[in-house]
Amino acid sequence: MHIKKYPELKDEIEEKYKFVYDKKVLPSMRSMQFAGKSIEISPNRVYNCAFLPIDSVESFSETMFLLLGGTGVGYSVQKHHVEKLQPINKPYSKRKRRFLIGDSIEGWADSIKVLMKSYIGDKRSSSIEFDFSDIRPKGARLVTSGGKAPGPQPLKECIVKIKGVLENKTDGENLSTLETHDIVCYIADAVLAGGIRRAALISLFSADDDEMISCKTGNWWETNPQRGRSNNSAVLIRHKITKDFFMELWKRIELSGAGEPGIYLSNDKEYGTNPCCEIALRPFQFCNLCEVNVSNIESQEDLNVRVKAAAFIGTLQAGYTGFHYLREIWQETTEKDALIGVSMTGIGS
């Protein structure tokens, strides 16, 4: 895959990948999972994680697109982001429009976009009747990425649940931060591999958002099990937070019995992170990570050559920015700040 993209670097690529074959260095996990045609078709699949604010209809469909491609998603439902969503404008109940869902990642993502646009926007639209007939049955082989298809049922349930949230609103109302969060969690519920959930999420919210702070209290796992799809973390701006506020929030975390919300300290409320909180990310940016296995390091020189190999592979990965489906801002941001992460694993061995 890399040699095909960078033929002039063939010799160095082969040399550095000997470290991978010897288990001394690891490229991004997604590049190991989807190397070849999957990444050539959708370069975003080389990246482990991404971050975006939920501030437009496209944010919902892009989240579905990224999760189905194997990328973990950090997202912001901070008040100043969710407020940018247009008010609810319910579709005409007596005017119907059929939408045939394509049997692809893009097709599933488009179904979310069409649903959200039918409820959010300036113009009142027809009600959407979704046609799932083109989606391959459960257990069918996925030719490009491998594995087996989940069938249409997870997407059907996702659309029904999201529609339920939207129908509970009245025209002119805005989605709340918690409702926006729940919609993203319903999207994650639809992302399955072998019948098992495979979506990773972290939801960042405003520190004074009481609904989000308490969304995992009580028997939430029975009444709102979708909320288990995401870690929820309050964004605390370092130069604004007070000890009293922090301790009050900490007490609420203890009382929740769930260990949440988490606390995400930041200097800028526009920056987010990936679900593992390994790195600060700009809005619409990907996390590019390689790892060095340090469990059997023999010398400083040994460590140096491994880090050099990992940095080289990370640089190759950073060049995969010819995204499709995603808005242009994704490519602009990822190229402007081409992250090259090199971490260490095996320190405790």
For the regions a language model picked out, list residue spans one by one.
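Extended catalytic cores of very large enzyme megasubunits
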Residues: 1-349
